[in-house]
């Protein structure tokens, strides 16, 4: 389980910086951090710049977070995705559902 999740709450949004691998072992830790934030209905901006690996379990965490945030009236944006992660979201069709970007708009660096 090799993951680090840093959360910073700002006036307008919550910024989350994730580092490490998102897989079947680390996904529960990530979910545990994201669920309370999603339940707030806040605007979440998640920086994935330092994510070295993600499997389908990680996709599931982000889909669940997206659904919860939307239900509570907030938004979710994934930022600083590598080409590999963008491709993963693209081939699964999630790129058309979840707001993703290869660049940051002021997220945690």
Curated annotation (Swiss-Prot):
UniProtKB keywords: Phosphoprotein
Residue span, STAS domain: 3-109
Post-translational modification: Phosphorylated by RsbW on a serine residue. Dephosphorylated by RsbP or RsbU.
Signal sequence extent: none
One Pfam family of this chain: STAS
Residues carrying Phosphothreonine: 57
Modified residues (Phosphoserine): 52, 56
SUPFAM superfamilies: SpoIIaa-like
Assembly, per entry: Monomer. In stressed cells, forms a complex with RsbW. The predominant form of this complex has a stoichiometry of 2:2 (one dimer of RsbW is bound by two monomers of RsbV). Binds to RsbW in the presence of low levels of ATP or under conditions of energy or environmental stress (through dephosphorylation by RsbP or RsbU).
Entry similarity comment: Belongs to the anti-sigma-factor antagonist family.
Protein known as: Anti-sigma-B factor antagonist
Organism, as annotated: Bacillus subtilis (strain 168)
């Amino acid at each position: 389980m090799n993951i680090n999740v840093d959360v910073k709450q700002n006036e307008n949004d919550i910024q989350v910086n994730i580092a490490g691998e998102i897989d079947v072992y680390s996904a529960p830790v990530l979910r545990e951090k994201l669920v309370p934030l999603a339940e707030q209905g806040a605007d979440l901006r998640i920086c994935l710049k330092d994510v070295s690996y993600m499997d389908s379990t990680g996709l599931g965490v982000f889909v669940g977070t997206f659904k919860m945030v939307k239900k509570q009236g907030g938004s979710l944006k994934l930022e600083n995705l590598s080409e590999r992660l963008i491709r993963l979201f693209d081939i699964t069709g999630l790129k058309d559902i979840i707001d993703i970007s290869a660049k940051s708009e002021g997220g945690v660096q």
